[in-house]
Every structure is written in structure tokens, then in C-alpha cells.
Regions:
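Acidic, Ala/Val/Gly-enriched low-complexity intrinsically disordered segments
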Residues: 3, 8-9, 24, 30
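N-terminal, polar/charged subdomain of small-to-medium soluble alpha/beta proteins
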Residues: 46-136, 140, 148, 152-193
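Intrinsic-disorder-associated, low-complexity terminal segments enriched in Asp/Asn/His/Tyr and depleted
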Residues: 5, 14-22
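Short polybasic linear motifs
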Residues: 33-36
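Cysteine-centered motifs
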Residues: 13, 39-42
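Short intrinsically disordered, low-complexity coil segments enriched in acidic
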Residues: 1-4, 39
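An anionic oxygen-ligand recognition environment, strongly enriched in 2H phosphoesterase
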Residues: 143
Length: 193
């Protein structure tokens, strides 16, 4: 926090500054708040990413052989950033197991997660989630975690999921392999964590 002219408190976030004086009364202040929120969210853009899909079924095939498959449940594409830590793994593990993508027994939407519904989870490691396009429109994956530490982190993430739920309900693809991933998206329902 900084103090501007006339002693008014200013909230800063990277390049944006928000003046707290007369905040509610000014339409420009709403825009300032949105910029501040966007900027603060950008701080978390370089942490582990999950693309979670509610599925009726999903499977992973490697070299023509199905190595994992689930019925109804959640499929998560898992992207690791080069700066990810154990805290990022724990955060995403809790979010994945707690996210409420299903209705309850009364039909109320967004009330149950995989645990309440006793469903399965399929995780697929996907370093391309941190891909960006270069000026020549070619993919660049320099922000993705390198293979050896990424495999260790991914295995740790799977271990956390198995410890936080039922181990036999957590499935995964094959780290580093070329995989064919098939799914029937239920809804469709897809969120990014």
C-alpha cells in the first residue's frame, strides 16, 4: 500500500493503482477494480493448471492399447508450470476433489463432487497447457516444467489424490507418452482450475 497526494491510500498491483477515496461513487473505479482483480489473477496464471471435464466415460490409449478408462466421473488434464511447488499440488488436489460438478439427489445443480457421488477420476499429464504461440505461430513450451521434475511432481500429485480419496478410483495416462484420449463430456461441463 502506498500513500498518494493528500494522504489518500492507494492499492497497487504491478502496474495498476487503485485509489480508495470515492471508490464506490465513480464508474471509473469499477473499471479500476476490474483491472486490479485481473492483474491479481495474473499472479496465479503461472501456477499449476487443471482442465477438468465432467465425463460419462473417458479412456487413454497408448500404442493401440487402452491403458486407463473410467465410467462417469471427472477427467483432468494436468499442466505443470516450471515454478510449481508442493503447495500448488496440494491446492489443485483439494480443488479437484472438492469441485461440485454434479447435482444432488434433489436435482439441485452444483452440489456434489466426485467424493459425494463415489465417482472415478482420470488424470492426463499435458505439458502443452503452458504452450504459447511465437511470432511465427509455432508452439513454445518454455514455461512448462521440464520432463524429469514434472514427472516427479505429477506422481506426487497422483499420490495426493489417492491419499485424499479412494486410491482405486484415481486413474492416469502414461507420462510423456503419445496418447489418444477419448471422452464423452457430460453437459458439456468443463472448468479450469
Amino acid at each position: 500500500m502506498q500513500v498518494g497526494n493528500k494522504g489518500v491510500a492507494l492499492q497497487t498491483c504491478h502496474r495498476h493503482t487503485l485509489n480508495k477515496k470515492n471508490f464506490v461513487s465513480s464508474p471509473i473505479s469499477v473499471l479500476s477494480l476490474l483491472l486490479l482483480l485481473l492483474c491479481c489473477c495474473c499472479q496465479f496464471a503461472d501456477s499449476m493448471r487443471l482442465v477438468v471435464q465432467r465425463v460419462k466415460s473417458a479412456s487413454v490409449t497408448v500404442d493401440g492399447k487402452v491403458i486407463s478408462s473410467i465410467g462417469p466421473g471427472a477427467m483432468a488434464l494436468v499442466g505443470l508450470h516450471e515454478d510449481d511447488t508442493k503447495d500448488d499440488l496440494e491446492f489443485c488436489c483439494k480443488k479437484l476433489l472438492a469441485c461440485k460438478l454434479w447435482e444432488n439427489d434433489n436435482g439441485s445443480l452444483w452440489r456434489h463432487g466426485v467424493k459425494q457421488r463415489n465417482l472415478e477420476v482420470l488424470c492426463v499429464s499435458q505439458f502443452t497447457l503452458y504452450g504459447t504461440l511465437t511470432k511465427k505461430h509455432q508452439p513454445d513450451y518454455k514455461r512448462s516444467m521440464k520432463a524429469i521434475p514434472a514427472q516427479e511432481m505429477y506422481d506426487a500429485f497422483l499420490g495426493m489424490l489417492r491419499n485424499g480419496y479412494e486410491a482405486e478410483k484415481i486413474f492416469d495416462g502414461q507420462f510423456g507418452a503419445m496418447m489418444d484420449v477419448s471422452l464423452v463430456n457430460d453437459g458439456p461441463m468443463t472448468i479450469v482450475i
